Amino acid sequence: MGRAPAKRKPSSPPPPPPPGRCHFWLPNKRRHCANTPLPTSQYCGNHLPDSASDAGAPFRRLVPCPVDPSHTVLEENLEAHVGKCPLKKQAAALAAQPFYSKGINSGGGEGGGGVTSAAKRALVHKLTKDELRALIEKIKLAHASAAMAMRDSFLVTDACDNWMRNQVDRKVPYQEKHVTQQASIIGNMEAFGLLQKGGEVAEENGVKNAPAVVEFGAGRGYLTQMLADCYGIRNVFLVERRSYKLKLKI
């Protein structure tokens, strides 16, 4: 005889939300939404119920923006949003630049000229199971041959190590693995002679000859902050097209 199906325990009601927090309950995370509610509602803009129904009604559906899936928009506003999406305007402005050449860094080479990403995906979906397995084996062999020529190099300088120790008791908005990666990037830069040892930069160089750092795709600026704190570099230029929260002040 088979086992009787296990009885599921009735789910307990969610606790009351903390003050000043959206009332929407996230069952997978077992907590309320961390956003601030709108002045006229108990919910934030992402979880606002339909104005035509009560608070217990289903929420309006959010869908990814087709221009940039990193943000979402209400489904009923999608058509209007696409026409005025700021990222669409940014992409159009970038394409209008005289130096812009679409896909120039995509690594097309001799065999991939003129083939779009969508066409490549379509070809992969048409593969049989055996063809897909053979393709995966080729990729594994190519990776193994390339990986043999690479070596791990995890270097952390004394200046960066002291900096990280001083951050232990601070509430920093980034994870430990990220700061160790950035410390190793700086350590390898010093090993290759791209940086002078901590403290020597500010002492040996005058104001006119002071080094400068330009970081493209700087994100929130954590890597450059470590450079500024550990190496006394004051001339920093951060380039980032996206608008991030929790950006550091250097």
UniProtKB/Swiss-Prot annotation:
Gene Ontology biological process? response to salt stress; tRNA methylation
An example of a Gene Ontology cellular component annotation for this protein is: nucleus
Comp. bias (Basic residues): 1-10
Q: List the EC numbers from the record.
A: 2.1.1.225
Coarse class of the primary localization is nucleus
Q: List the disulfide bonds.
A: none
Asked if the record carries the keyword Metal-binding, the reply is yes
- Residue ranges annotated as compositionally biased, kind Pro residues, are 11-20
Q: Which UniProt keywords apply?
A: Cytoplasm, Metal-binding, Methyltransferase, Nucleus, S-adenosyl-L-methionine, Stress response, Transferase, tRNA processing, Zinc, Zinc-finger
Q: Which reaction does it catalyse?
A: cytidine(4) in tRNA(Pro) + S-adenosyl-L-methionine = 2'-O-methylcytidine(4) in tRNA(Pro) + S-adenosyl-L-homocysteine + H(+); cytidine(4) in tRNA(Gly)(GCC) + S-adenosyl-L-methionine = 2'-O-methylcytidine(4) in tRNA(Gly)(GCC) + S-adenosyl-L-homocysteine + H(+); adenosine(4) in tRNA(His) + S-adenosyl-L-methionine = 2'-O-methyladenosine(4) in tRNA(His) + S-adenosyl-L-homocysteine + H(+)
Q: Which Gene Ontology MF annotations are present?
A: tRNA 2'-O-methyltransferase activity; tRNA methyltransferase activity; zinc ion binding
**Residues annotated as region Disordered?**
1-20
Compartmental location: Nucleus; Cytoplasm
Q: Which PROSITE patterns match?
A: ZF_CHHC_U11_48K
Q: Where are the zinc fingers (CHHC U11-48K-type)?
A: 62-89
Enumerate the residues binding Zn(2+). Answer: 65, 71, 81, 85
| Induction summary | Induced by salt stress and abscisic acid treatment.
Extra notes?
A: Seedlings subjected to salt stress and abscisic acid (ABA) treatment exhibit a dramatic increase of 2'-O-methyladenosine (Am) nucleoside. Plants over-expressing TRM13 show improved salt stress tolerance, and plant silencing TRM13 display decreased stress tolerance.
Tell me the protein family, please: Belongs to the methyltransferase TRM13 family.
Q: What is this protein called?
A: tRNA:m(4)X modification enzyme TRM13
Q: Which organism is it from?
A: Oryza sativa subsp. japonica (Rice)
